[in-house]
Amino acid sequence: MHGKQALRGNRPYQKAGTVIVAASCCWGVGISFVGMVHATQDPAARLAMLQRSRGPWIAGQFLAAAGTAAVPIGFVRFAQALRSGPAKTLATGAAAALVAGAPLFVVALADRASDLDKFAYRRGPSWPFLTYSGLHIGALAALGAGLLLSPLKPWTGITAAASAPAFGAILAGTKDIPPFVFYLVEAAVGAQLMRYEEPAAPVADTADAGRLGLAHP
């Protein structure tokens, strides 16, 4: 074949977005098992609900833990795909915050699965969840700034950046925040990454490569 062919390469943005969306959906499905327990105010009623649905509850916590652990992987891949510069630095910082915070929530989910009474009555220290939430909010702030410097559409970065102070105010005021809001924003970012049309990469044909002195497999 003569001339040049345009290839899309490895599509790193789209692959990163796929991981983020799939992991966020996994988290959402898992956390929805016995989902009404999160809206139930009475501890005794929460415990009774969990005891009636112990199997689905435990399975849901494992699914949510898998999603929690996998979401940061997608953002690590996104950061790796960016060219060196401020956007990459900010995205790397966001990914690092997510990686640091994920184990805290995974441990909390494992605790929920193993001790129904403790979760129903909201016993135990609050610092792991507060730290996880704080890291997540910091990650969204850095991610939003990084996205605004990336080739993606501006609304993606604006959404992430604007959510950070809003979520921070909620967390500071109530000492609590539903984690699904984090994954909703991140899934939206992932969906935009999946839709991003990455520039085609020109590839030299055999004759061109020979003239340029490039090696062939």
Model-derived regions: residue spans:
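Hydrophobic, aromatic-enriched alpha-helical segments typical of multi-pass transmembrane helices
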Residues: 2-217
